[in-house]
């Protein structure tokens, strides 16, 4: 019976050692997974920063050419506004005189389609 008890004790100890080994293996696996996840996150962040840098460079190149177009359009607009302002200054008095003449100089006339009954 003592040998049976000793055999059971050996089995229990072996089971305990096996459980410890399984526990250690799980811990190692979790550490490896955590490390792999951190490395993947770092790689993703590095890739994202690289792509963002490339995007900003392309955006700056596109907006740089757009900025020169914008300044050209603004310059042309100022020139046209200057020309229109000059036309306004030249023709203001004449247009005002014509407008006042149409409003104030009324000549009553009978319409050509009006018939006098008689």
Swiss-Prot record:
NCBIfam families from the UniProt entry: V_ATP_synt_G (TIGR01147)
Protein name according to UniProt: V-type proton ATPase subunit G 1
Pfam family membership, one: V-ATPase_G
One GO cellular component term: lysosomal membrane
Tissues showing expression: Kidney; localizes to early distal nephron, encompassing thick ascending limbs and distal convoluted tubules (at protein level). Ubiquitous.
Localization per Swiss-Prot or TrEMBL: Apical cell membrane
Residues with PTM N-acetylalanine: 2
Oligomeric and partner information: V-ATPase is a heteromultimeric enzyme made up of two complexes: the ATP-hydrolytic V1 complex and the proton translocation V0 complex. The V1 complex consists of three catalytic AB heterodimers that form a heterohexamer, three peripheral stalks each consisting of EG heterodimers, one central rotor including subunits D and F, and the regulatory subunits C and H. The proton translocation complex V0 consists of the proton transport subunit a, a ring of proteolipid subunits c9c'', rotary subunit d, subunits e and f, and the accessory subunits ATP6AP1/Ac45 and ATP6AP2/PRR.
Keywords assigned: Acetylation, Cell membrane, Hydrogen ion transport, Ion transport, Membrane, Transport
Keyword Zinc-finger: no
Any one GO molecular-function label of the UniProt entry: ATP hydrolysis activity
UniProt record similarity statement: Belongs to the V-ATPase G subunit family.
InterPro entries linked: V-ATPase_G
Gene Ontology BP, a term: intracellular iron ion homeostasis
Protein function: Subunit of the V1 complex of vacuolar(H+)-ATPase (V-ATPase), a multisubunit enzyme composed of a peripheral complex (V1) that hydrolyzes ATP and a membrane integral complex (V0) that translocates protons. V-ATPase is responsible for acidifying and maintaining the pH of intracellular compartments and in some cell types, is targeted to the plasma membrane, where it is responsible for acidifying the extracellular environment.
């Amino acid at each position: 019976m003592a040998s049976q008890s000793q055999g059971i004790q050996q089995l229990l100890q072996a089971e305990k050692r096996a459980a410890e080994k399984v526990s250690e293996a799980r811990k190692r696996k979790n550490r490896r997974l955590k490390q792999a996840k951190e490395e993947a996150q770092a790689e993703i962040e590095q890739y994202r920063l690289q792509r963002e840098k490339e995007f900003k460079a392309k955006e700056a190149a596109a907006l740089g050419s757009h900025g020169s177009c914008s300044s050209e359009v603004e310059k042309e607009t100022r020139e046209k506004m200057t020309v229109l302002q000059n036309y306004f200054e030249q023709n203001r008095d004449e247009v005002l005189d014509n407008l006042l003449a149409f409003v104030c100089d009324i000549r009553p006339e009978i319409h050509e389609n009006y018939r006098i009954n008689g």
